[in-house]
Amino acid sequence: DYIARLAEVTRTHPLLKLGISPRGALALCRTAKARAFAEGRDFVVPEDVTQMAEYVFAHRLMLSSKARLNEYTPEAIVAEVLAQTQPPVLSERRA
């Protein structure tokens, strides 16, 4: 759900001509899973998603003319999207 919300924000962002596609969202899901595995977990936490988002999203975004004129970068847009999209809050599991 968090990844889908991030992708949706990119699709409606005023400085983007083209946001993240469903395939881009799936790529973020896969890389977040890989990061979780590398960290020794069999589950993804929001930090996995936020840490991988720039690597997965930045080259997939198409900036608008206004964004390019004002020297925005895809990385800056990804950071903005992450800042304005509330990550899910994890609750502790109870036995």
Regions found by a protein language model. Give the residues of each.
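C-terminal engagement/docking regions of AAA+ P-loop ATPases
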Residues: 1, 10-95
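Helix-loop-beta hinge of the Bergerat
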Residues: 6
